[in-house]
């Protein structure tokens, strides 16, 4: 360590917000270059390279072939798939000296597709799966959590190309199986969850989440063991309500009833229910005005805005992230005053269905607003809701009888105890970090970029694609996040920067000679070693650094070696401490390390 490019820190960096970011910097694995941008130091690269080696072994094992694309990419392919616009501010864009547009790659779907298009033309060339491990770039608005949410990161991305949908599915499950083996070998707990495809497009997707409290993603678990990303949850179909005995809708004055609580109080005082119970928040149809910011598309030459209204039960709140996933690649925001001015029929506090969507024409509305409802609003249900006049509401307005909608969406937050989509029981929730995702892309990119091959009949057909990503640098951070204690990191043996941390203590040259001999014996057995040969550093500091760096095994060569020729062996956490004769130390350490692997 006296010559190793390494400096450990005693204090946590002031801006480190999660344990992995604190420990990786303190232990000398990474250094911050700028927000969301990190320099890899020798120890960090050792671990990163070992993770990459495991990924390569498993991905090569399913027949994939490695390539390497540039990170600086031209604009044109991304325009063809509309992702130049869809990514918005999330990508780094630049111009060369000739004013040509480029971007720093956030992903490489377009480039992989064009490469196969350039080289392959027949069904006989397929199937093929290509992958790379490469640096990606995304202009995160607020980088956080160290390597977990950065602007520059290392990612493994693979793409399968097959002649038909069946081939795509086979490639998908081959890759999925390889992912499970990778995470198991890395000793990283994971949960596969059903997910939305988002801007990537495609028909099916699963995320691999590492459960941990700092995770940005919430996922739902069913008693059956199945799991869903919250955005991908679907509400089990609810039975239609028989509205034959529901009183006719009535429109009544409701002064001072702009809030849910005011509406409930007013309803119970002025309009008692006929079914023996009081009005409650779940009886109120809350209509939320939202602006959809669409990117450019085939019908619009520039981004455009659309105002919509979403109806949800009054006891639920709109989950914008969940709702936005269904509008991808568009973005959602609460409607502005300027948006509302375009629709004078929307009376704040009293917005109701009777001027929206299918009802707009009968109400004389010339610029109708699309009306969507959450899946918890079932046909036949009667509602207390706005009447589109100031201080006036409807009672007993029945969905299906009195008003219709333009569509049904998953709009509200999901609660603990809600029924799971598979009907196996109530949902519970955990948080996790996405470490991988697999997509069945289908024909999205092959059609957009005209990737076709001749089939067995000589007909040009589009190629079926799959996409598979692992956040390599994020995986490293997640392992650090889940493999540490108060003293420091505790790496799984398979990716630790070394097998043994040899510590020479004291001032006697004999101890250092014994340590050097042990290092040579360990290296002769093929074991990597970190050797702390610093002579002006106290034993206490050396032991603290050994715990901080997190190598699985520690060997102490000091006073006991000088006095009786023994070397102390122990695990990183200080357990299984034993003194062995120096001649047996290398073999004992090799056996211990083999047992860990």
From Swiss-Prot:
It catalyses: tRNA(Pro) + L-proline + ATP = L-prolyl-tRNA(Pro) + AMP + diphosphate. GO terms for cellular component: cytosol. One of its GO terms (biological process) is prolyl-tRNA aminoacylation. Keywords: Aminoacyl-tRNA synthetase, ATP-binding, Cytoplasm, Ligase, Nucleotide-binding, Protein biosynthesis. Its main location: cytoplasm. Its EC number is 6.1.1.15. One of its GO terms (molecular function) is ATP binding. It comes from the Bacteria. InterPro entries: aa-tRNA-synt_IIb (IPR002314), aa-tRNA-synth_II (IPR006195), aa-tRNA-synth_II/BPL/LPL (IPR045864), Anticodon-bd (IPR004154), Anticodon-bd_dom_sf (IPR036621), Pro-tRNA-ligase_IIa (IPR002316), Pro-tRNA-synth_IIa_bac-type (IPR004500), Pro-tRNA-Synthase_IIa_type1 (IPR023717). Pfam families: HGTP_anticodon, tRNA-synt_2b, tRNA_edit. It is found in: Cytoplasm. PROSITE patterns: AA_TRNA_LIGASE_II (PS50862). Homodimer. NCBIfam families: PRK09194.1 (NF006625), proS_fam_II (TIGR00409). Belongs to the class-II aminoacyl-tRNA synthetase family. ProS type 1 subfamily. Catalyzes the attachment of proline to tRNA(Pro) in a two-step reaction: proline is first activated by ATP to form Pro-AMP and then transferred to the acceptor end of tRNA(Pro). As ProRS can inadvertently accommodate and process non-cognate amino acids such as alanine and cysteine, to avoid such errors it has two additional distinct editing activities against alanine. One activity is designated as 'pretransfer' editing and involves the tRNA(Pro)-independent hydrolysis of activated Ala-AMP. Consists of three domains: the N-terminal catalytic domain, the editing domain and the C-terminal anticodon-binding domain. This is Proline--tRNA ligase. It comes from Bifidobacterium longum (strain NCC 2705). The gene is proS.
């Amino acid at each position: 360590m006296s010559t190793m490019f390494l400096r450990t820190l005693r204090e946590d960096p002031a801006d480190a917000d999660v344990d992995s970011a604190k420990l990786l910097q303190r232990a000398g694995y990474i250094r911050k270059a700028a927000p969301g941008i990190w320099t890899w130091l020798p120890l960090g690269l050792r671990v990163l390279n070992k993770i990459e080696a495991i990924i390569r072994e498993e991905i090569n094992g399913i027949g994939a072939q490695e390539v390497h694309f540039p990170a600086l990419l031209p604009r044109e392919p991304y325009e063809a798939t509309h992702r130049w616009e869809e990514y918005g501010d999330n990508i780094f864009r630049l111009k060369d000296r000739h004013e040509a547009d480029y971007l720093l790659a956030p992903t490489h779907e377009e480039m992989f597709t064009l490469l196969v298009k350039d080289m392959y033309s027949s069904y006989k060339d397929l199937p093929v799966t290509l992958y790379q491990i490469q640096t990606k770039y995304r202009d995160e608005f607020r980088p956080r959590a160290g390597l977990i949410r950065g602007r520059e990161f290392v990612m493994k991305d693979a793409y399968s190309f097959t002649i038909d949908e069946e081939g795509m599915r086979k490639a998908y499950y081959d890759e999925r199986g390889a992912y499970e083996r990778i995470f198991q070998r890395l000793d990283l707990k994971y949960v596969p969850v059903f997910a939305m495809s988002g801007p990537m497009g495609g028909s099916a997707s699963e995320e691999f989440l590492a459960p941990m409290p700092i995770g940005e993603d919430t996922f739902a678990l069913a008693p059956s063991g199945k799991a869903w990303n919250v955005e991908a949850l679907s509400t089990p179909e609810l039975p239609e309500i028989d509205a034959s005995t529901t009183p006719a809708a009535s429109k009544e004055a409701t002064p001072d009833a702009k809030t849910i609580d005011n509406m409930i109080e007013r309803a119970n005082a002025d309009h008692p229910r006929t079914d023996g119970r009081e009005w409650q928040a779940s009886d109120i149809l809350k209509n939320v005005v939202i602006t959809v910011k669409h990117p450019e598309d085939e019908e619009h030459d520039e981004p455009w805005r659309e105002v919509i209204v979403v109806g949800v039960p009054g006891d639920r709140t709109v989950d914008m992230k969940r709702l936005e996933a269904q509008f991808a690649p568009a973005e959602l925001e609460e409607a502005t005053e300027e948006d509302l001015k375009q629709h004078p029929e929307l009376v704040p506090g009293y917005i109701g269905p009777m001027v929206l969507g299918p009802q707009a024409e009968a109400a004389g509305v010339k610029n109708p607003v699309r009306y969507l409802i959450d899946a918890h609003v079932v046909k036949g249900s009667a509602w207390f809701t706005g009447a589109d006049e100031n201080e006036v509401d409807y009672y007993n307005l029945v969905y299906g009888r009195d008003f219709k909608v333009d569509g049904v969406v998953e709009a509200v937050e999901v609660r603990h105890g809600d029924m799971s989509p598979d009907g196996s029981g109530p949902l519970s929730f955990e948080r996790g970090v996405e470490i991988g995702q697999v997509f069945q892309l289908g024909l999205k990119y092959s059609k957009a970029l005209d990737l076709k091959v001749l089939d067995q009949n000589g007909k040009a057909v589009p190629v079926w694609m799959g996409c598979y990503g692992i956040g390599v640098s994020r995986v490293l951070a997640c392992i650090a996040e889940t493999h540490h204690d108060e003293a420091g990191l505790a790496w799984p043996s398979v990716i630790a920067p070394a097998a043994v941390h040899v510590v020479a203590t004291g001032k006697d040259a004999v101890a250092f000679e014994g340590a050097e001999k042990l290092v040579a014996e360990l290296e002769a057995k093929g074991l990597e070693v970190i050797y702390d040969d610093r002579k002006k550093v106290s034993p206490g500091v050396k032991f603290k650094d050994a715990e901080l760096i997190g190598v699985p095994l520690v060997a102490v060569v000091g006073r006991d070696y000088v006095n009786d020729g023994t070397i102390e062996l122990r695990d990183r956490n200080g357990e299984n401490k034993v003194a062995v004769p120096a001649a047996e130390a290398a073999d004992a350490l090799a056996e211990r390390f083999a047992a860990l692997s």
